[in-house]
From Swiss-Prot:
Classification via PROSITE patterns: SAM_RMT2
Originating organism: Debaryomyces hansenii (strain ATCC 36239 / CBS 767 / BCRC 21394 / JCM 1990 / NBRC 0083 / IGC 2968) (Yeast)
Keyword Cytoplasm applies: yes
Cellular component annotations (GO), alphabetically ordered: cytoplasm; nucleus
Superkingdom as given in the UniProt entry: Eukaryota
Location within or outside the cell: Cytoplasm; Nucleus
Subunit structure: Monomer.
Keyword terms, alphabetized: Cytoplasm, Methyltransferase, Nucleus, S-adenosyl-L-methionine, Transferase
Ranges where the RMT2 domain occurs: 193-434
Gene: RMT2
Family: Belongs to the class I-like SAM-binding methyltransferase superfamily. RMT2 methyltransferase family.
Gene Ontology biological-process entries: methylation
Stretch list, region Disordered: 155-198
Listed Gene3D superfamilies: Vaccinia Virus protein VP39
Name this polypeptide is given: Protein arginine N-methyltransferase 2
Amino acid sequence: MSDLHELCGFQTRPIGPKYIEDLKFYLKNGIPATYTIEEAYNYTNNIEEEPTTTTTPLHIICSHIPNDASNDEIDIINQMVEILLEYGAGWCLTDINDDTPGCILIRRKLNNTPIYNQVVAAGVRAELLLRKVSEYDMEIIEDTDDLNHEQFEGIQGEETTEEERKEEEPSNTSDIIDEQKVEQPKEDLKEDPSSNQETYLKTKLEYKDGALVTKDRKDGVMMSWETDLMRMGCDSLFKGASIDGEIDDEVNILNIGFGMGIIDTMINNKNPTKQYICEAHPDVLAKLRLDGWYEKQNVVILEGRWQEQLNKLLSEGNVFFNGIYYDTYSEHYEDMLELFDIVVGILKPHGVFSFFNGLGADRQVVYEVYKQLVEMDLANYGLICKFEQIEVPESTLQLEVQNSTDNKSVWDDIKRAYWTCPTYYHPEARFMDV
């Protein structure tokens, strides 16, 4: 463990301004804000392999914030986190427990602190910066490549001079590196139906009790535990069916992604003028036909990807919707951004847009980041998004049911739990001037 790591462990109390001075000194002398305990250990023990975990100074701080810290100490710690983030500390790097700094704060019930808010804000900035970098196909150089560990050994905090304390321009690129580290290899992603839309549409699906899954891999495409969330979505869509308390003459509802048909059944029970269902997967389309959806008088099935089908509707300009719901599988946030561009063209001025909000829902801090991103991105399209916060059923959060022969986890026979957050943020978006 280096002096930087020891500093972030708060071995000396009280935590005062000297901590900030020493932290700045280490960073200004070339120790990266992402320098990990694992890298220091490997160097000390002459291990050449790349470490598989990344316990950074930010992890150490979040793990060692004293439970009895005074307000003054919390203020110093908050400044230290701010400095580390300015120098490129990775907000979503994971330690030996697969925890990000934000995960540690949540586990320690410190997610109502300014420190946690800083971590979330760093995630938002990183995502926005990553988008901009991706536009220009820029190469990112990792700031821990070719580290001179011997140089770090000679750095002593007490040798700081006034001149060395002058502000320097910090680097902010390592958050992008964090994003890259959590990605799978591209060749794996291409064959993964949960990550690649083209692969998913060629993958056989299976309807089983309470779930729609990929037949061979058992990826959870949709599950019945989502029913209450779908009911909220349906209720939101029909809020766009009235103007000043008067029901619209023509109530048109669009759902993108049929899945198990949970929300579409709810929509149909409310008897809209027209119910549009956009679905691309051949097995799901076969289910639609088998269950008689093609014969329902007020239902229009749009066969194919929404990217093609909705652009046709937009070009024709003959139908506009009181409510639009989006819940597809194997698409990404970039796809949602493309959808926003179409939504504003086919949504009635008093209409409501909603979606199944599973963005980053396998890690709470990432879920918080995407909540803020959605608000910002929809605002750019003239939509204001409000979130209703509800608690997710306890059974959904139980990956395993211990000491029980009767109960089963909802995730039994599912490849991976795609939801681990205790809270669901239900989105409801309208045009700002409504």
